[in-house]
Amino acid sequence: MVNIIMVLYSIFLFLPAFIANPGAVITGGHFILDRGKTIHGKRILGDGKSLSGFIGGSLIGVLAGIIVYYIIYISNIGLGNYGNNIISALPVLFAMSFGSLTGDITGSFIKRRLGMKRGAKGSLLDQWPFVLMSFLFIFIFARHFFLEFYGNFIAIILILVLTPPLHRGVNILGYKLKMKDVPW
């Protein structure tokens, strides 16, 4: 039987992956990853993917995870955490955050191959690659955590369902705050 509280808790634990993406928008813009290079006349990634955004966004995700870790630790919820201590939590947080932005970059790469320009609405290509790559990184680098919180796949499915409206809302906010050129 599925424990709904554990499923919701697992979604809460995924916050670093969600926060890494807007963190990349805040810190991005310096040292464009593809340096303007093309494949068959199409940009590899585009100007929206930068080293400063990748590293800065990932570190913001890790920082968010450290905050979540201590909230859980202090509140003594008893449902588990990223690790037994902050040091053992770091591989999970790094895998989740860097995986998230690796997925975002992968989505951009696919969009460019399909001929979609930067800022073009890519629907699920804008929304799911960061989630899926984050889970892949967690599975590879923190398998014990993955199996404990996402092994039954129900939380993964719910995160995939919740991501499109959440992603849209965050992008609208970024657009209204003049941090994004388009609201998607």
Curated annotation (Swiss-Prot):
GO terms for cellular component: plasma membrane. Keywords: Cell membrane, Lipid biosynthesis, Lipid metabolism, Magnesium, Membrane, Phospholipid biosynthesis, Phospholipid metabolism, Transferase, Transmembrane, Transmembrane helix. It is an enzyme of class 2 (transferase). InterPro entries: CarS, CarS_archaea. GO terms for molecular function: CDP-2,3-bis-(O-geranylgeranyl)-sn-glycerol synthase activity. Its main location: membrane. It is found in: Cell membrane. The chain crosses the membrane at residues 4-24, 54-74, 86-106, 122-142, 145-165. GO terms for biological process: glycerophospholipid biosynthetic process. It catalyses: 2,3-bis-O-(geranylgeranyl)-sn-glycerol 1-phosphate + CTP + H(+) = CDP-2,3-bis-O-(geranylgeranyl)-sn-glycerol + diphosphate. It holds the Pfam family CarS-like. Pathway: Membrane lipid metabolism; glycerophospholipid metabolism. Its EC number is 2.7.7.67. Its cofactor is Mg(2+). It is a multi-pass membrane protein. It comes from the Archaea. HAMAP family: CDP_archaeol_synth. Belongs to the CDP-archaeol synthase family. Catalyzes the formation of CDP-2,3-bis-(O-geranylgeranyl)-sn-glycerol (CDP-archaeol) from 2,3-bis-(O-geranylgeranyl)-sn-glycerol 1-phosphate (DGGGP) and CTP. This reaction is the third ether-bond-formation step in the biosynthesis of archaeal membrane lipids. This is CDP-archaeol synthase. It comes from Picrophilus torridus (strain ATCC 700027 / DSM 9790 / JCM 10055 / NBRC 100828 / KAW 2/3).
